């Protein structure tokens, strides 16, 4: 679940009603009350921790496991390299399993993080072109044609509208996302929409 989403509470309700076994909280810092509510509902909580201090806070608030994800990841990313996060967090956090994500695509990298103390690794883009993937065929073809330099992170235009950067292949969709941000923020500043409505656009 994206923790900075304005409808997070409703999403938690759905997870609890469906009796899911694990809830992953990413895309912002979860409140302790949200972690507590999920755990009281019977699910385990996996939280993303982009720094050591936040990892400790997530554990104190009840997280059952952590994911540390570096800037090399596909999708939502943090500002620090995966290897730097691993060296900062893995030697210290021993109370809960820690999974490493971001830029991992080969067995040697997996072995390195396991050797450093990771409980496991998370891979996403590595599987996007698999037969089992529901990604559109055109996306799979674009992904196969692309190289690492074809994926760039999005940027935040206005601090009133926090954006967790997303690493994605540059295409018409990423350009449209940036233009939509500009238009929605302009509508907000002109008083045409309130902040919540703007964030949902």
What are these regions (language model features)?
Residues 79-99, 105-201:
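Conserved active-site-proximal phosphate/metal-binding subdomains
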Residues 1-97:
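Active-site entrance/lid segments in N-terminal catalytic domains of soluble metabolic enzymes
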């Amino acid at each position: 679940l994206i923790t900075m989403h304005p409808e997070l509470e409703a999403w938690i309700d759905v997870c609890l009603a469906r009796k899911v076994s694990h809830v992953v909280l990413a895309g912002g810092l979860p409140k302790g009350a949200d972690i507590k509510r999920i755990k009281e509902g019977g699910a385990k909580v996996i939280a993303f921790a982009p720094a050591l201090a936040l990892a400790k806070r997530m554990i104190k608030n009840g997280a059952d496991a952590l994911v540390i994800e570096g800037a090399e990841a596909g999708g939502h990313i943090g500002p620090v390299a995966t290897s730097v996060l691993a060296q900062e967090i893995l030697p210290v956090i021993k109370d809960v399993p820690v999974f490493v994500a971001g830029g991992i695509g080969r067995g040697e990298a997996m072995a390195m993080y396991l050797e450093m103390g990771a409980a496991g690794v998370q891979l996403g883009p590595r599987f996007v072109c698999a037969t089992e993937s529901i990604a559109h065929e055109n996306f799979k073809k674009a992904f196969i044609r692309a190289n690492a330099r074809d994926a760039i992170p999005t940027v935040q235009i206005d601090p009133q509208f926090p954006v967790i950067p997303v690493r994605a292949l540059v295409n018409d969709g990423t350009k449209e996302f940036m233009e939509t941000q500009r238009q929605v923020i302009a509508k907000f500043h002109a008083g045409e929409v309130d902040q919540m409505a703007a964030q949902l656009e």
